[in-house]
Amino acid sequence: MTDTFPHAHDITGSGPVLLLAPGGAGHPMGLGPLTERLAARFTVVTYDPLGLAHGRLGRPVAEQRVADWSEGAHRVLEEVLPPGESAYVFGTSSGGIAVLDLLARHPGRLAHVVAHEPPCVTLLPDGARRRAELIDGLDGPEPPPAEGGSATPMGVFLAHVLRPFTAHAPGFTAPPGRLTVAAGADSRGQLLYDTAHLLADRLNGAFAEFPGGHLGTLEHPEEFAALLTDTLTRGSPTTKEPRTVRTTG
């Protein structure tokens, strides 16, 4: 484990390197069961971009930038990757946005990237409205604190991550066979399922369904880890036929 902020990370397991980028404000809370299963196959490097699990929760946090998270992830990989080897990468939610940007900026040593329900909703038809609805649905009248002794990772996410990250609109072309954009089976018909499908089509990736919903990593860690391992090590699953993204309202 290293406490060096802003590139804090934890390492467990053995095998090829797999970088995990958690969602929310990057705190890896709840990912233990998933990490434990993945560690049987990979050297799992869990990235903590703000150091929230490494003693910095409650300290002041600036407005976050996607590029800062992806560059931090790149530096972590440069530190932990053995010479000549490539890394597998998984990110969910805001972490999914960060790993897409990582692939756009530094594709050279990435074997395969899986981005799970990245909320790049501005790419959808009427994306500005959909983004505003998403923010309104998460941002209640009394959000949890982002600083001080009672600060929570959710408070940090709402105050400093949600708005800049949901404004991010990736526009690169992924190297063939090296990107999968995933959504939960329980998310069918919902905003982030549509977003994942559109991203896979636009970025030259494959689309895959994973167990559970947006929190499938927490809800079904065993099944999620098994499918993630298969997707990473065997390449992109069969891409579903492109479909028209719905707008509502």
Outline where the language-model segments fall.
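Conserved HGGG/HGGXW glycine-rich cap/lid loop of the alpha/beta-hydrolase fold
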Residues: T2-R56
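Charge-dense, helix-prone N-terminal extensions
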Residues: T2-T4, G51, P83, S94, ...
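Short beta-to-alpha linker loops that shape the active-site pocket of alpha/beta-hydrolase fold enzymes
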Residues: D48-L52, P119, P211-G213
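Active-site loop/oxyanion-hole signature of alpha/beta-hydrolase fold enzymes
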Residues: P49-A87, L199
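Conserved hydrolase catalytic core segment
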Residues: E85-L124
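Helix-rich cap/lid subdomain of alpha/beta-hydrolase
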Residues: P118-T166
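Conserved serine/cysteine hydrolase catalytic core
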Residues: E147-L218, A225
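Catalytic active-site module of serine/aspartate enzymes centered on a nucleophile-bearing elbow/loop
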Residues: L203-G249
